[in-house]
Protein backbone atom coordinates (compact mmCIF):
# COMPACT_ATOMS: atom_id res chain seq x y z
CA UNK A 1 0.00 0.00 0.00
CA UNK A 2 2.84 2.42 0.84
CA UNK A 3 4.43 1.99 -2.61
CA UNK A 4 1.03 2.43 -4.28
CA UNK A 5 0.49 5.71 -2.40
CA UNK A 6 3.68 7.13 -3.89
CA UNK A 7 2.83 5.95 -7.40
CA UNK A 8 -0.66 7.49 -7.24
CA UNK A 9 0.36 10.55 -5.16
CA UNK A 10 -2.56 9.79 -2.81
CA UNK A 11 -2.75 9.16 0.92
CA UNK A 12 -4.58 5.83 0.87
CA UNK A 13 -4.22 5.27 4.60
CA UNK A 14 -1.01 6.55 6.18
CA UNK A 15 -2.85 6.61 9.53
CA UNK A 16 -3.72 2.93 9.09
CA UNK A 17 -0.25 1.59 8.30
CA UNK A 18 2.09 3.59 10.57
CA UNK A 19 2.16 3.91 14.36
CA UNK A 20 1.86 7.42 15.80
CA UNK A 21 5.49 7.30 16.94
CA UNK A 22 6.93 5.65 13.80
CA UNK A 23 10.58 6.30 12.98
CA UNK A 24 11.14 6.46 9.20
CA UNK A 25 14.74 6.80 7.99
CA UNK A 26 15.57 7.51 4.36
CA UNK A 27 18.72 6.04 2.82
CA UNK A 28 20.40 9.43 2.48
CA UNK A 29 19.87 10.56 6.13
CA UNK A 30 16.51 12.34 6.63
CA UNK A 31 14.57 10.84 9.53
CA UNK A 32 10.89 11.42 10.28
CA UNK A 33 10.03 10.77 13.93
CA UNK A 34 6.25 10.49 13.95
CA UNK A 35 3.30 9.77 11.68
CA UNK A 36 2.32 13.43 11.27
CA UNK A 37 5.79 14.27 9.94
CA UNK A 38 5.68 11.23 7.59
CA UNK A 39 2.32 12.47 6.31
CA UNK A 40 3.64 16.02 5.86
CA UNK A 41 6.74 14.74 4.03
CA UNK A 42 4.59 12.59 1.72
CA UNK A 43 2.26 15.47 0.84
CA UNK A 44 5.03 18.09 0.50
CA UNK A 45 7.37 15.85 -1.54
CA UNK A 46 4.60 15.09 -4.02
CA UNK A 47 4.31 18.82 -4.82
CA UNK A 48 7.95 18.75 -6.03
CA UNK A 49 8.03 15.55 -8.06
CA UNK A 50 6.55 12.17 -8.80
CA UNK A 51 7.54 8.56 -8.30
CA UNK A 52 7.34 6.88 -11.70
CA UNK A 53 8.50 3.39 -10.69
CA UNK A 54 8.73 1.67 -7.32
CA UNK A 55 8.91 -2.01 -8.13
CA UNK A 56 9.14 -4.70 -5.47
CA UNK A 57 11.66 -7.33 -6.56
CA UNK A 58 11.29 -9.64 -3.55
CA UNK A 59 10.59 -9.62 0.15
CA UNK A 60 11.29 -11.75 3.20
CA UNK A 61 9.21 -11.80 6.37
CA UNK A 62 9.98 -13.35 9.76
CA UNK A 63 8.16 -12.63 13.02
CA UNK A 64 7.85 -8.82 13.24
CA UNK A 65 10.38 -7.94 10.52
CA UNK A 66 10.12 -7.61 6.75
CA UNK A 67 12.93 -6.92 4.29
CA UNK A 68 11.87 -5.62 0.87
CA UNK A 69 14.18 -5.33 -2.14
CA UNK A 70 13.04 -2.76 -4.71
CA UNK A 71 13.88 -0.54 -7.69
CA UNK A 72 12.95 3.15 -7.48
CA UNK A 73 12.77 5.97 -10.02
CA UNK A 74 11.45 9.51 -9.65
CA UNK A 75 11.15 12.60 -11.82
CA UNK A 76 11.37 15.94 -10.06
CA UNK A 77 9.63 19.09 -11.29
CA UNK A 78 13.06 20.73 -11.85
CA UNK A 79 13.95 18.00 -14.39
CA UNK A 80 16.17 15.88 -12.12
CA UNK A 81 15.69 12.14 -12.41
CA UNK A 82 16.87 9.72 -9.72
CA UNK A 83 16.89 5.96 -9.88
CA UNK A 84 18.46 3.32 -7.69
CA UNK A 85 17.99 -0.09 -6.14
CA UNK A 86 17.12 -0.26 -2.48
CA UNK A 87 16.09 -2.28 0.52
CA UNK A 88 13.63 -1.40 3.26
CA UNK A 89 13.93 -2.90 6.72
CA UNK A 90 10.46 -2.79 8.29
CA UNK A 91 9.53 -3.52 11.92
CA UNK A 92 5.87 -4.22 12.71
CA UNK A 93 3.74 -3.97 15.86
CA UNK A 94 1.49 -6.80 17.02
CA UNK A 95 -1.46 -5.03 15.36
CA UNK A 96 0.35 -4.92 11.97
CA UNK A 97 1.40 -1.28 11.91
CA UNK A 98 4.86 -0.09 10.89
CA UNK A 99 6.83 1.18 13.91
CA UNK A 100 10.18 1.53 12.13
CA UNK A 101 11.23 1.69 8.50
CA UNK A 102 14.83 2.14 7.35
CA UNK A 103 15.76 2.48 3.68
CA UNK A 104 19.13 1.50 2.21
CA UNK A 105 20.11 2.50 -1.33
CA UNK A 106 22.48 1.11 -3.94
CA UNK A 107 23.70 2.86 -7.09
CA UNK A 108 22.74 1.27 -10.41
CA UNK A 109 25.96 2.24 -12.19
CA UNK A 110 28.12 -0.57 -10.76
CA UNK A 111 31.55 -1.62 -12.02
CA UNK A 112 34.51 -3.83 -11.12
CA UNK A 113 37.51 -1.63 -10.16
CA UNK A 114 39.85 -4.65 -10.63
CA UNK A 115 38.64 -5.51 -14.15
CA UNK A 116 41.83 -4.27 -15.88
CA UNK A 117 44.44 -4.30 -13.10
CA UNK A 118 45.46 -5.76 -9.76
CA UNK A 119 45.26 -2.21 -8.45
CA UNK A 120 41.80 -0.66 -8.23
CA UNK A 121 40.81 1.78 -10.97
CA UNK A 122 38.05 3.96 -9.57
CA UNK A 123 35.89 6.16 -11.74
CA UNK A 124 36.50 9.86 -11.49
CA UNK A 125 33.02 10.75 -10.41
CA UNK A 126 31.44 11.91 -7.22
CA UNK A 127 30.31 8.96 -5.11
CA UNK A 128 26.60 8.92 -4.29
CA UNK A 129 26.39 7.76 -0.71
CA UNK A 130 23.14 6.40 0.53
What are these regions (language model features)?
Residues 1-10, 17:
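Short, aromatic-enriched amphipathic alpha-helices that serve as compact interaction elements
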Residues 11-64:
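A solvent-exposed, acidic/Ser-Thr-rich amphipathic alpha-helical stretch
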Residues 19, 92-93:
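Short, acidic, Ser/Thr-enriched surface-loop or helix-capping motifs
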Residues 47-48, 73-83:
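Short, cysteine-centered beta-strand-loop-beta hairpins and adjacent loop/turn segments enriched
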Residues 52-55, 69, 82-88:
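Short, surface-exposed coil-to-beta transition loops
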Residues 63-72:
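A short hydrophobic beta-strand element
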Residues 102-130:
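Low-complexity, intrinsically disordered terminal/linker segments enriched in charged
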